[in-house]
């Protein structure tokens, strides 16, 4: 069984998609071993509790220095003994020590077709605002492994979503979630859980 820990900062809609997929068998060979948030008010913690998944908050605000936070945060992650760490809307910079320790074992969902609208400053609604301002006709989502850069790790899965006339950032965000994020994130976890994903020279191969 693949032991999966999920890190999340907000409402946890992607977390819910993962939970649902594990429970309905879309994700196989997987156990959700814990949820960690940097926000004690994150509804994601409630979602986890509703499904008897251990959940806790570790916030940078509770520590005098970022080094102290990084140390405790990494300890809490290590305690879960995860085989895979999923960033599902986690708005805290991951310590580099954690990235090196869990090389190619951390994945992130980003609400654009990387390399478009990604990197520093592109998160949440800002991605969709930028896409509409540029006038693109197709947007989407990307699941990728996490490296030391911002949204620069090897790409696992992508799914495109059409922009429709009259879209607002909020409407587009919801469509990207429903048509892309909530589908490819569970799919990526299932592929990894079943040993179908390999990384070589910065590129992902998926066994059929």
Q: What do these predicted ranges mean?
A:
Residues 1-208:
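One-carbon transfer enzymes
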